[in-house]
Amino acid sequence: MSVTITPLKPTRSELLRYVKFGIDLYKDNDCYVPPLVLDEIDTLSPKKNPAFDVCRAKSFMAYKDGRPAGRITAIINNVVNSRNKVKELRFGFVDFIDDDEVVDALFKTVEDWGRTQGMETIIGPLGFSDMDHEGMLIDGFDQIGTIATIYNYPYYAGHMERMGYTKDIDWVEYRIKIPESIPDKYARIAQIVKTKYNLRSVPLKSRKIVKERYGQALFKLINEAYSDLYGFSPLTDRQIDHYVDQYLGLIRLDCVSMIVDSNDDIVAVGISMPSLSKGLIKSRGKLFPTGWIHLLKALKGKSEVVDLLLVAVKPEYQNKGVNALIFN
C-alpha cells in the first residue's frame, strides 16, 4: 500500500477537494461542526485572503492507494516571525486518517518544505491569523464543537507525540450557565467602573452603522488587546477591511456589547452569537441549495446556547473591572 503526497494548486476545484476531505472525514461524527465551505476555500486562496500579503503558504494532500487520506497547510507568517525574531513554520488545516505512514509522510513533506524556506522550528495547528481555526483537541471529544473552535479525533494527539511533537500551551473552552438575573454585586461593580472611568455602553441599532463607524476601530482594538497573547498575528489594514466586510454584516446586534469612553472611542467589546453548530451540521457547511435555511433559523431564532466569540479590552483598561460592563 503506497502513500503519495501532492502539492495543492490554489484553484477552486482543488481547494474544494481539500476542504471537502476535512468534512467527509467526520461524516459519522455527531460532535464535529464543519466550517462554511466557501469561507474555508476563500481562506486558503491567495486571491481571496489578504493574509497572503504577509504570509507564504503551501498546502498538501495525502493519498493512500489513490484515495484521499490526509491534508495539511504549511504557513510562514512573516510579520510574526519578524516581530518575534524567529524562523518559525506554522502548520494548520490538518486532518488525517489513523495511519502512521500517512501522518509521517504529511509532516515530513511540510517539515522539508519549511527547511527549503529557511525555517528552523515548526508549531501548530495555527492559521494565517487568529481569525482562523487553531489548536488541537486533547479532551472533551464527547462535546459538540462550535463554529470558532477545532474538533478532531482522539488519535491525532497520539500521532503528534509519536513523531516527537510536544504540547506548548493549553487553550481551555468553558461552558457557563447564565443566571436568571444579574447578581447585585456584579451590577454594582459595573456601575462603579462606568462612573470611575466615564464609560458607557453603546446601543447598537444598525449593522451598517456598526460597520462604518466602529468596524475599523473594533479590529484595531483586537490588535491592541491581543498583542501579547500566544501566537498572535496582528491584522493588516487589508485584513481588517476583509473581516469587517465578512463578519460585521452577520452579527446579531443584541449579541454585541460595545463600551466606549467620553470621546466615543471603543475601549472594550464582546461579540457572541446564537450557536450555529446544529445548523452547520445539518447543512454540512454548505449554503446551497438549502443550507442557508438551517443557518438562518439558528441565527435569527431562539437558542439555548450562545457562543462567545471574543472579548477584547484596551490594554490600559484591563484588570479594572471593564468586563463587568461588557457582560452586564
What are these regions (language model features)?
Residues 1-31:
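Generic start-of-chain signal for non-secretory N-termini
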Residues 3, 150-230:
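Acyltransferase donor/substrate-recognition loop-hinge adjacent to the catalytic core
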Residues 14, 35-46, 53-62, 67-71, ...:
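Catalytic cores of nucleotide-enabled group-transfer and carboxylate-activating enzymes in metabolic
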Residues 17, 102-105, 151, 155, ...:
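Generic recognition of stable, solvent-exposed alpha-helical segments in well-folded globular domains
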Residues 22-64, 72-82, 209-313:
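A conserved beta-strand-loop-helix scaffold within acyl/acetyltransferase catalytic domains
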Residues 83-164, 286-328:
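Acyl-donor binding region in acyl/amide transferases
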Residues 120-127, 168-175, 258:
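A structural signal for short, well-ordered beta-strand segments and their strand-loop junctions
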